[in-house]
A protein has these predicted regions:
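Acetyl-CoA-dependent GNAT
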Residues: 4-67, 72
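Conserved acetyl-CoA-binding loop-helix of GNAT-fold acetyltransferases
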Residues: 77-90, 115
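Short glycine/proline-centered loop/turn elements that form peptide/ligand docking sites
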Residues: 81, 85, 106-109, 126-132
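Conserved GNAT acetyl-CoA-binding A-motif
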Residues: 92-105
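Conserved catalytic-core motifs of GNAT/GCN5-like acyltransferases
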Residues: 101-103, 119-136
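Short beta-strand-to-coil "C-cap" segments at the C-terminal boundary of structured domains/repeats
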Residues: 138-142
Length: 142
């Protein structure tokens, strides 16, 4: 088998993944995959023209995955992260999402997320590097 970089836009990997995953869904559930189950989001906060906070992720089926949440150090402690988490929960409820998932490293914001109702469901030590661990967290919407 030959491995090579993608140089053509005829079939991008996303198209391939979608085709294969749709086939798996339809085989498992014995029905067509509904439209609108996958979407991405990017939310940001600005102070004038300055970007001071951002959050992005994906929604697949009934789960939201927060990929990144960052607050400019000059703006930390002003509840911007809390506003994003509250907004994500409200938005998730509106569109029928039942759980919000995220990961955070040992030197990041585990306690912040616990304060906002997230639970740790997994932990890997020395990931992504020695001396650092990653927490896997979930918030179940009621």
């Amino acid at each position: 088998m030959t491995h090579y970089p993608v140089e053509s836009t005829e079939l991008m990997p996303e198209d391939f993944y979608e085709r294969v995953f749709t086939h798996g869904y339809e085989t498992y559930f014995n029905q067509p995959k509904p439209e609108g189950l996958d979407q991405s989001f990017i939310w940001q906060m600005k102070d004038g023209e300055r970007l001071v906070a951002a959050m992005d992720g994906k929604i697949r089926y009934q789960a939201m995955k927060i990929e990144n949440l960052a607050i400019d150090p000059d703006y930390q402690g002003q509840r911007l992260g809390s506003q994003f988490i509250d907004y994500a929960k409200d938005y998730a409820r509106q569109i029928g999402v039942t759980s919000i998932l995220l990961t955070t490293r040992t030197y990041q914001a585990k306690d912040f997320h616990v304060k906002h109702g997230f639970e740790v469901y997994g932990f890997l030590e020395d990931v992504p590097m020695p001396g650092v661990g990653v927490y896997y967290m979930i918030y179940r919407l009621k």
